[in-house]
Design a protein with these regions (language model features):
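Generic detector of well-ordered alpha-helical packing
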Residues: 87-91, 144, 166-167, 182, ...
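Acidic-glycine-rich active-site phosphate/pyrophosphate-binding loop
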Residues: 73, 168-181, 339, 509-514
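Hydrophobic helix-and-loop "lid/oligomerization" segment in the mid-to-C-terminal part
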Residues: 2-3, 10-138, 158, 208-429, ...
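Short alpha-helices
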Residues: 174-228
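Acidic, two-metal ion nucleic-acid-processing modules in DNA metabolism proteins
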Residues: 98, 103, 239-334, 369, ...
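Histidine-centered active-site/metal-ligand motif
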Residues: 166-167, 182, 356, 414, ...
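Histidine/acidic-residue-rich, glycine-tolerant segments that coordinate divalent metal ions
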Residues: 142-194
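Generic structural signal for hydrophobic
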Residues: 131, 154-155, 620
Length: 660
């Protein structure tokens, strides 16, 4: 687990901050946050006051007039239309929005979403041939198709096609009847940040404007869901759409979204972009990863409450399955990393037989969070490995793969994430090649993650009022990230692990008027480095904690470090004392790591500090006295081993490192 981070605090521009304070009447902290985001007065007005009336004319998108005419003609002639979508949340929501809209116009419309494992992303010829055979007159793609020149070319004389997409456009644009993509050449649409569902929504707007002369503003909650999930910049139109969509989600949401919110346990919360990204979107994504994405579309298009509830429950269960798959693969991957020793110093490359390919990307992201190295997770099936890559800041993983392309069967992606396939017997060779590449291209400093901090806050200035003022910048997302603050000196009043698996940490900080709660997700390691009375610096985001009618500020920890660390010193006598304590704490049977650590801190000898006492567990593991394992329910446990005979402390690397 990474403990240290590079703290990078944004510099101040007091002149610009004062201009924003004067012209826009914002709080000084809000002004600083806006300057950090390069927002001037004019942009600030649009940022803070932008509304649905500021949405751009959909006909400014190239080929929109052609697309509208073709859709209208197809509907008037009662010819069948198929929406060809994608299995991620952007594709699911784009399919749902366009389907619901075309149904409203009376269209004969259905949808087709490829199966993730067998068909993969985007258009495939076999599926289009099937649609032609079934008599489809018009295919409208959403969130895909811009790179499918050859496939479109093969069918364009037999079926009409409209491409709507938001991905980077290649030089060779498919020769469909219409191509709507704000990133293609000669498209003068001002906003280049729309998601796939955003582009589909603009098609709906254009059709509705032509039919009624009015803006189409239905289903904005679905559009917001896909926009946030696809991690596009939340500025310009995206910010307006998401802001309005969240308002709808919190007042009169789509039936399927309401049921999804209920099963996720968020029905008493005000839904934010964070809830979409971390709670709702994963449940929709799980369908495409584990089963089939059509179930997620069915949830969003149904008007039957019983059906919506049943599908929401099903997706919730599918998400649990996804989490279990992910947890199991993650644990196997961690064991693989540990067994590799120094081979994993520069790059993480792990592989396993029949690891579910739908979750290896998530596992790769978790391993980056844990070890902060470029990471490749590979699922092997029938001798072929399918890999997913995630990178670290400043390192182009696509270029790294390209340097090894002679080892790979195929690869693709971009700087931050990529995918590839490889013969399983060449994985070790790939690891060696990437290790050499990383040695040359990654500095020691780049292996230390950066926590970017917007501003320092004195601990006594943190209250609910500052949270309310900062909330003017919501919704948060890419290009408008959740503000991160720092307290550079605070004393820990208490620290404890929480959650069923004791894998989250709660730190209580002292203030002049009371205390502040701070939460660190997935950081049980803090219990071994931070103790009651420790003086720390903390980087955090802010949120409200509502409990029994009381509202208080809560710090969500991004990074926390003691200003001075206790030194670790081990002695033969000290370990003898700790052996007695640990043996009594174990009571001859398995115990949770947390319970044993609590007992150690409660009973340790006065001449041993906390870190030294807890480090004794590492010595006992190395000597085989205790063994760490994960229980069936995912909890870290210790097992006591009855060992006969004398043990030699010099066989413990930890003892040799810290002995005095």
């Amino acid at each position: 687990m990474i403990k240290k981070k590079r703290w990078r605090i944004s510099t101040s521009d007091k002149e610009q901050e004062n201009i924003l304070i004067r012209e826009l009447g914002v709080n000084p902290i809000v002004a600083k946050l806006m300057v950090n985001r390069h927002i001037d007065v004019d942009e600030g007005r649009r940022f803070l006051q932008g509304s649905l009336s500021d949405l751009l004319d959909p006909f400014a998108l190239k080929d929109m007039d052609v697309a509208v005419s073709l859709v209208q003609e197809t509907i008037e002639k009662h010819k069948p239309i198929v929406i060809y979508g994608d299995y991620d949340v952007d594709g699911i929501t784009a399919t749902s929005v366009l389907y619901r809209f075309l149904k409203k116009l009376g269209a004969d419309v259905t949808y087709y979403i490829p199966e993730r494992q067998s068909e993969g992303y985007g258009l495939n010829l076999e599926a289009l041939e099937l649609l032609i055979e079934q008599g489809t007159a018009l295919v409208i793609t959403v969130d895909c198709g811009i790179s499918s020149y050859d496939i479109v070319e093969a069918v364009r004389d037999r079926i009409d096609m409209i491409i709507t997409d938001h991905h980077t456009a290649p030089d060779m644009i498919p020769r469909a009847k219409a191509v709507i993509n704000h990133k293609q050449k000669n498209c003068h649409y001002k906003d280049k940040n729309l998601s796939g569902v955003g582009v589909a929504f603009k098609l709906c707007q254009a059709l509705w404007l032509t039919k009624t002369g009015e803006w189409y503003l239905d289903d904005l909650d679905i559009v917001a869901l896909g926009t946030v999930a696809d991690v596009v910049p939340l500025v310009g139109e995206n910010r307006i759409i998401v802001k309005a969509g969240l308002e709808k989600m919190n007042s009169h949401p789509n039936l399927g979204i309401k049921k999804l919110v209920d099963v996720a346990g968020l029905h008493e919360r005000t839904i934010t972009s964070g809830h979409i990204g971390f709670t709702l979107a994963p449940r929709l994504n799980a369908a495409g990863r584990v089963t089939h994405a059509t179930r997620a579309v069915e949830l969003l298009v149904t008007d039957n409450a019983d059906m919506a509830e049943a599908i929401a429950e099903e997706l919730n269960e599918t998400n649990r399955e996804r989490q279990e798959l992910e947890r199991n693969i993650h644990e196997l991957a961690r064991i693989d990393v540990a067994n590799q020793g120094h081979k994993a110093d520069y790059v993480t490359v792990v592989a396993g037989e029949d690891w579910h390919p739908g979750v290896i990307g998530i596992v790769a992201s978790r391993l980056v969070e844990e070890f902060y190295k470029p990471t490749l997770v590979i699922s092997i099936h029938d001798g072929i490995g399918k890999g997913s890559c995630r990178s670290i800041d400043g390192f182009n993983i696509y270029d790294a793969l390209k340097s090894c392309e002679d080892v790979l069967l195929q690869f693709g992606g971009h700087a931050a994430a990529a995918g590839f396939s490889i013969d399983a017997n060449r994985i070790d060779e790939l690891r060696d090649r990437l290790t050499a590449y990383c040695k040359e291209h990654v500095t020691t400093e780049e292996y230390i993650p950066v926590v970017a901090i917007d501003a320092e806050l004195p601990v006594d200035d943190i209250d609910v009022d500052i949270i309310d003022r900062v909330s003017a910048l919501e919704p948060y997302g890419m290009a408008n990230s959740t503000p991160v603050f720092a307290v550079m000196e605070a004393t820990v009043q208490d620290i404890m692990l929480m959650g069923q698996l004791k894998n989250h940490c709660k730190v209580i900080l002292e203030t002049s008027s009371g205390t502040l709660d701070a939460i660190a997700w997935n950081r049980p390691d803090l219990f071994k480095t931070i103790f009651i009375g420790t003086v720390v610096k903390v980087a955090f985001s802010l949120q409200k904690n509502e409990w029994q009618g009381m509202v208080s500020p809560q710090l969500m920890i991004q990074a926390i470090e003691p200003l001075t660390e206790e030194p670790i010193t081990l002695s033969t006598e000290g370990l003898r004392q700790m052996y007695v304590i640990v043996k009594q704490a174990m009571r001859g049977r398995s115990q949770s790591v947390y319970n044993v650590e609590q007992e150690i801190l409660r009973r340790k000898p006065a001449d041993q500090n906390n870190r030294s006492a807890l480090t004794s567990l590492d010595v006992f593991k190395e000597l085989g006295i205790i063994e760490e394992y994960t229980s069936d329910d995912g909890q870290l446990m210790l097992r006591w081993n009855a060992i006969e005979g004398k043990l030699d402390l010099v066989t413990s690397v930890t003892f040799l490192t810290y002995s005095v």
